[in-house]
């Protein structure tokens, strides 16, 4: 800006030079402003002008834009941030005896805070008012040992916690003696009430203990004899038995005739088959009795072991049971058992319980039992004896008696064989080796057994009594009705 406007003389700008005695004052002010930290960057270009008028403007601009520094007030003249109650409390607590006169309060405040050295009339009047109006300050009469003017002032003992955390800047609440008395009476009442309640609770507890002792003594005098206290001659406790040992050791055994006749609705049920030679079973197999006593259900293994282990027991079997076991009515038993009873049978042969079709599946132990019992009953009772006719009379719904006996004795002839398919007539001789063979519970010819059951099913379907028969068996769809080419050997341990 100065380069554009070259000033040759002050008259070209129309500025009249003002020369007076104040010119030296402005120069001094400008120098003071420059030395005092003003806008020195602006003063340097202005110094190009050598005319005193420019120096005058320069000093005015520098003083106008300079920092404003008012006259600082001394620290002693600042009013302290304490209330009059706080000032009086400071003076009392600073005294050696925790009590001080009114003149001593004045002297303490003026020595500590110089602000109160002036205008003594105003603040001293406020001090007197606060001493008389606040109940936290207590006036103590003067004794004769210390002569002087005025009484002592001290703090109330309950007012020491007026200020929070000992800071005189913050006061909790206005101290009132009535509140202190109310609090004291309230605390006394609560303390008395607690003591009264404690005495009452102690008395009630003592009375309850006495009642418990009296009741215990009464119970001890009239306590009945318990069953556990009754000792036998050996010193062991004997609980009462609801039934005799002979009855408790007898397992529940149902014959195939009774279950099949009940399921088919036939009135010809044989209740004598439920006994099933208990004397022979008790004398030869006590551990099996214990097992069946715990299971309380029908077990095919019991019949199997009774037929194998005790020939004299099998000789005592009634003829209807022998004939029915020979005729292979075991498939009808599967109609009366739910799948939840699959745990009765042995674990390796769990085909019947795992397939889910409880009404149409067969257990391998049952099949082996039926074949084995058929073989045993074959040489015990001939096929044409009255026992076979008894089964025919007892079970009118079954027309397959001589068909199965023809399977067991492969040389007999019967009119029902004419109704069977031609492929089955060629396979009747294959079952001849089953009579003398032993059947373990885990491996057998499963296809031969299945063909025997299929022949019974075909015989049932072709019999004239099949219209009203309730013993129809549903086979699982996984088993085909016709024999495929090749002999399949089923291992029950796989299932």
Curated annotation (Swiss-Prot):
Residue stretches of biased makeup (Basic residues): 286-295
Gene3D superfamilies membership: Winged helix-like DNA-binding domain superfamily/Winged helix DNA-binding domain
GO molecular function, one term: DNA-binding transcription factor activity
Location in the cell: Nucleus
GO biological process: anatomical structure morphogenesis; cell adhesion; cell differentiation; cellular response to chemokine; chemokine-mediated signaling pathway; DNA-templated transcription; mesoderm development; positive regulation of transcription by RNA polymerase II
Biased composition (Polar residues): 233-245, 297-313
Keyword Phosphoprotein: no
SMART domains the record matches: FH (SM00339)
Basic and acidic residues bias (residue ranges): 178-197
Subunit structure: Monomer.
Functional description taken from the UniProt entry: DNA-binding transcriptional factor that plays a role in a broad range of cellular and developmental processes such as eye, bones, cardiovascular, kidney and skin development. Acts either as a transcriptional activator or repressor. Binds to the consensus binding site 5'-[G/C][A/T]AAA[T/C]AA[A/C]-3' in promoter of target genes. Upon DNA-binding, promotes DNA bending. Required for cell viability and resistance to oxidative stress in the eye. Promotes cell growth inhibition by stopping the cell cycle in the G1 phase through TGFB1-mediated signals.
Name this polypeptide is given: Forkhead box protein C1-B
């Amino acid at each position: 800006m100065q380069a554009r406007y070259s000033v040759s003389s002050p008259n070209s700008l129309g500025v009249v030079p003002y020369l007076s005695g104040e010119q030296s004052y402005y120069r001094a002010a400008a120098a003071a402003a420059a030395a005092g930290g003003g806008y020195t960057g602006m003063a340097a270009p202005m110094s190009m002008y050598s005319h005193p008028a420019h120096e005058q403007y320069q000093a005015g601009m520098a003083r106008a834009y300079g920092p404003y520094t008012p006259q600082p007030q001394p620290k002693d003249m600042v009013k302290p941030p304490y209330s009059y109650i706080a000032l009086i409390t400071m003076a009392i607590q600073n005294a050696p005896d925790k009590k001080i006169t009114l003149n001593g309060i004045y002297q303490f405040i003026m020595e500590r805070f110089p602000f109160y050295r002036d205008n003594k009339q105003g603040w001293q009047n406020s001090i007197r008012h606060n001493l008389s109006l606040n109940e936290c300050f207590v006036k103590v009469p003067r004794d004769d040992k210390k002569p002087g003017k005025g009484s002592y002032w001290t703090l109330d003992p309950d007012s020491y916690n007026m200020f929070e955390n000992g800071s005189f800047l913050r006061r909790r609440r206005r101290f009132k003696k009535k509140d202190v008395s109310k609090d004291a009476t309230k605390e006394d009442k609560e303390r008395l009430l607690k003591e009264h309640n404690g005495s009452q609770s102690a008395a009630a507890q003592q009375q309850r203990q006495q009642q418990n002792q009296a009741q215990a003594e009464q119970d001890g005098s009239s306590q009945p004899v318990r069953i556990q206290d009754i000792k036998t001659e050996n010193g062991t406790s004997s609980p009462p038995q609801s039934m005799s040992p002979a009855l408790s050791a007898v397992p529940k055994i149902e014959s195939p005739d009774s279950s099949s006749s009940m399921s088919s609705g036939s009135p010809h049920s044989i209740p004598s088959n439920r006994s099933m030679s208990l004397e022979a079973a008790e004398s030869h197999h006590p551990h099996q009795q214990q097992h069946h006593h715990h299971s309380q259900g029908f077990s095919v293994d019991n019949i199997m072991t009774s037929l194998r282990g005790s020939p004299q027991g099998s000789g005592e079997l009634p003829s209807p049971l022998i004939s029915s076991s020979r005729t292979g009515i075991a498939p009808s038993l599967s109609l009366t058992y739910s799948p939840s009873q699959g745990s009765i049978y042995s674990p390796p042969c769990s085909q019947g319980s795992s397939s889910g079709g409880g009404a149409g599946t067969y257990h391998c132990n049952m099949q082996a039992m039926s074949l084995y019992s058929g073989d045993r009953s074959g040489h015990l009772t001939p096929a044409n004896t009255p026992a076979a006719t008894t089964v025919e009379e007892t079970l009118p719904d079954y027309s397959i008696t001589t068909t199965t006996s023809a399977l067991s004795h492969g040389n007999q002839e019967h009119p029902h064989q004419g109704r069977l398919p031609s492929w089955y007539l060629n396979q009747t001789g294959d079952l001849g080796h089953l009579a003398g063979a032993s059947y373990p519970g885990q491996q057998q010819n499963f296809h031969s057994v299945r063909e025997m059951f299929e022949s019974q099913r075909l015989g049932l379907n072709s019999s004239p009594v099949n219209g009203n028969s309730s013993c129809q068996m549903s086979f699982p769809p996984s088993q085909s009705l016709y024999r495929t080419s090749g002999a399949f050997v089923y291992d029950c341990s796989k299932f």
